[in-house]
A protein has these predicted regions:
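Short beta-strand element of Class I
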Residues: 2-4
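Rossmann-fold dinucleotide-binding core
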Residues: 85-169
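Rossmann-like NAD(P)-binding element
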Residues: 6-21, 25-89, 95-100, 107, ...
Length: 172
């Protein structure tokens, strides 16, 4: 799956330096986060200052920054103008309120927003939770479930928008 990986711009060197280093590290970690080192070639580095135009070509945008509501909401405000009219935006939060995250999104994007929580380490953990917001379109969830099951090989459970969803509440 072709992927664009975002991070903050580097303070020194190339603007995408933080991501370039992260991609290089993916091929060195154990256990390996990628099934094949060659998969790193499908990852395009980008940063939040100069790379937001990349989002216009994305079908699925998964936000996975630190678990702070204010940071996530600030990021959504920043990227929303670059999300195309058919793209799905999902948060990989492990327990923040999906409806509260959706509150800052433009109305035309809210029906394409939900939570998708991959458990760590994602390559080795089979389960993913899908958490709809009250505004999420059912067809968006069905399409995301199909992608997660068929392309990523995950089992999917639907969770309600409650603190920590299902897995973290029961300690998975």
């Amino acid at each position: 799956v072709d992927t664009v990986l975002f991070d903050l711009p580097a303070k020194e060197g190339p603007a995408d330096g933080v991501v370039i280093k992260a991609i290089a590290n993916l091929t060195k970690l154990s256990p390996a986060p990628l099934a094949s080192k060659s998969y790193a070639e499908a990852i395009t580095p980008a940063n939040y200052e100069t790379g937001l135009e990349h989002l216009r070509d994305c079908d699925l945008i998964i936000e996975a920054i630190a678990e702070r509501m204010d940071w996530k909401q600030d990021l959504y405000k920043k990227i929303a103008p670059f999300v195309n009219d058919t793209a799905v935006l999902a948060s990989n939060t492990s327990g923040l309120g999906i409806n509260k995250l959706a509150d800052v999104l433009p109305e035309q994007l809210r029906h394409r927003f939900c939570g998708v929580h991959f458990f760590n380490p994602p390559r080795y953990m089979h389960l993913a939770e899908l958490i709809p917001a009250s505004t999420t379109d059912a067809a968006v969830l069905e399409g995301l479930e199909t992608f997660v099951v068929t392309h990523l090989g995950k089992g999917v459970v639907y969770a309600k928008d409650t603190p920590n969803f299902i897995g973290n509440r029961i300690g998975v």
